[in-house]
Amino acid sequence: MLRIAILGRPNVGKSSLFNRMCKRSLAIVNSQEGTTRDRLYGEIRGWSVPVQVIDTGGVDKDSEDHFQKHIYKQALAGANEADILLLVVDIRCGITEQDAELAKMLLPLNKPLILVANKADTFKDEHRIHELYKLGISEILAVSASHDKHIDKLLQRIKTLGNVPEVVEEFSEEEVEEEAVPSMELLSKEPLSDYEEEEIPFSTTSAPDKPLKIALIGRPNVGKSSIINGLLNEERCIIDNVPGTTRDNVDILYSHNDRSYLFIDTAGLRKMKSVKNSIEWISSSRTEKAIARADVCLLVIDAQHHLSSYDKRILSLISKHKKPHIILVNKWDLIEGVRMEHYIRDLRATDVYIGQSRILCISAATKRNLRHIFSSIDELYETVSSKVPTPVVNKTLASTLQKHHPQVINGRRLRIYYAIHKTATPFQFLLFINAKSLLTKHYECYLRNTLKSSFNLYGIPFDLEFKEKTKRTN
């Protein structure tokens, strides 16, 4: 894999260049300095080799921002990780002291280095390029990331430096399938006989060869980045006790026990009225997008605090997108005199969604139960990806009906002729019944709870679809 690192002082347009190269809006772009703090990873598609682009935070050693030492460390790690380096400067400002410091840091690495003179929006701007040779970098290219000017020349130069063969860009069959919206006839048009099995395709979007996408979500300062760093045994995300340290969604690819995971470390959601029209609001909207994108969501809460309205809001977003999830109760090392099972029992009683979730108490600080996160994710996703056999579904429902008969309404009783596990994403059962008017909310809840406990569907939002069918008579 060819790796390209983008470096520079704050507010020179690194994230705009990153988004332009990846052709996706992965990094937050804003005029406020320090928008990007962690390393962000993207990819350039359509090349003959895999290409990863690393966006780093703005380095300014003279800044009083206490995040700067962490940002510098992350930027240096990105530079060491990369094969080709892009030092981005603002051509309109000329050479600054920070630009010179960064050039001194990167030149000794003896890696292909391009000085990207960004914000060359006009012909006059481009003519100022000769001033930049004082930095001692021979490769200089003027571009405008915001106007997509000369980006193609930059990419071509990267191909040359990286010895990337030219190919005709085309989408692979795998990429086409990934973008396609599945369409299928789910139900047979033939009448359903009494307990007669129908040939109904089972729908699932699981792709075992692709990384399992895991979104870490939660309020600011609950330890999401600490959990990531603890799992990976390296500092990939900046950690601080100031809420809102992570602003971008940070994608981190990691392999464990021959399985690939793509962790998405998200910005914490905050009260909407306090973040409107700001970077934090953008981050909040990105958090919901990360939920929609994920295969499994990990909601992180602080063991020291009661479940807040914001935690419930996040959980409702997970439910809205029907995502399998696990609640991670972090900072368990700070809890004294409480048995874990009692804590979990009391937590389940606080909210209906919590009561239906899987809960794991952990400590990122001491790494207690961190490795159980992987096994919990695998178990949850295995349940989601597996079809419940039709005979098992119907045997379970038959037992359910015997234990608790539906009530009689106007001389008639609800009959369930047949049921199948219809889809995995979202998880859905299809039940064929005699009349929807005979199905009460109470009995639907009873059926839901029975299926949830019978097939261990805790942490898996699932739907019950009811379809009226007339029982075939001979």
Curated annotation (Swiss-Prot):
InterPro entries according to UniProt: G_ENGA, GTP-bd, GTPase_Der, KH_dom-like, KH_dom-like_a/b, P-loop_NTPase, Small_GTP-bd
Segments forming domain EngA-type G: 2-166, 212-385
One GO-annotated biological process of the protein: ribosome biogenesis
Gene3D superfamilies: 3.30.300.20, P-loop containing nucleotide triphosphate hydrolases
Domain KH-like, residue spans: 386-470
Keyword Glycoprotein annotated: no
Residues where GTP 1 binds: 8-15, 55-59, 118-121
Record bears the keyword Transcription regulation: no
Keywords: GTP-binding, Nucleotide-binding, Repeat, Ribosome biogenesis
Binding of GTP 2, residues: 218-225, 265-269, 330-333
Gene Ontology MF, one: ribosome binding
Family indicated by similarity: Belongs to the TRAFAC class TrmE-Era-EngA-EngB-Septin-like GTPase superfamily. EngA (Der) GTPase family.
Its biological purpose: GTPase that plays an essential role in the late steps of ribosome biogenesis.
Subunit structure of this chain's protein: Associates with the 50S ribosomal subunit.
Designated name of the protein: GTPase Der
Organism of origin: Chlamydia caviae (strain ATCC VR-813 / DSM 19441 / 03DC25 / GPIC)
Lineage: Bacteria, Pseudomonadati, Chlamydiota, Chlamydiia, Chlamydiales
Recorded name of the encoding gene: der
